[in-house]
Regions:
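Short, small-residue-biased leader/transition segments that mark boundaries at the very start
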Residues: 1-2
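A glycine/threonine-rich phosphate-anchoring loop and its flanking beta-alpha core
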Residues: 35-134
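Short glycine-rich or small-residue beta-strand-to-loop segments that form or flank ligand, phosphate
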Residues: 13-16
Length: 136
């Protein structure tokens, strides 16, 4: 996907899916706009997003990022966070910066009303888990 995006140089990147798809879209957006970045440098090593040691690159200069969630739970379509997993080591690297906020989120409540009950209940549990993590 990243290779193809560099070939046709889109002015808009749309992520459609759940939280993992949103995170993958954000990562692809970063890699498209700033192929020189090192994710180990960008990985969150701090407790407060405002007190970071790494200056995140300016986003949105080549393409807008639009998030279209198909499930509820992570809230990735409206948060400045993304998680990338190193396939070789299995280590997850959280990225956090307000530059990762999508330009727009298109949320269709009817989509959840017509989703399978299993997806809806799993999304609800995920949303509850995300909520509880903020308290811990």
């Amino acid at each position: 996907m990243l290779f193809r995006s560099r070939l046709f140089e889109p002015d808009c990147i749309i992520a459609l899916g759940g939280g993992s798809a949103m995170d993958a879209g954000k990562i692809m957006w970063v890699m498209y706009e700033h192929p020189e970045v090192d994710f180990l440098d960008m990985a969150m090593r701090f407790m407060d997003i405002r007190k970071r040691v790494y200056t995140f690159p300016k986003m949105g200069e080549k393409a807008y990022f639009i998030a279209v969630p198909t499930s509820a739970g992570t809230g990735s379509e409206v948060t400045p966070f993304a998680v990338i997993t190193d396939q070789d080591t299995g280590v997850k690297y959280p990225l956090a910066d307000y530059e990762l906020l999508p330009k727009m989120a298109i949320v269709d409540a009817d989509m959840m009303m017509s989703a399978p009950k299993g997806l809806t209940s799993a999304s609800g549990i995920d949303a509850l888990t995300q909520d509880r993590k903020s308290v811990v």
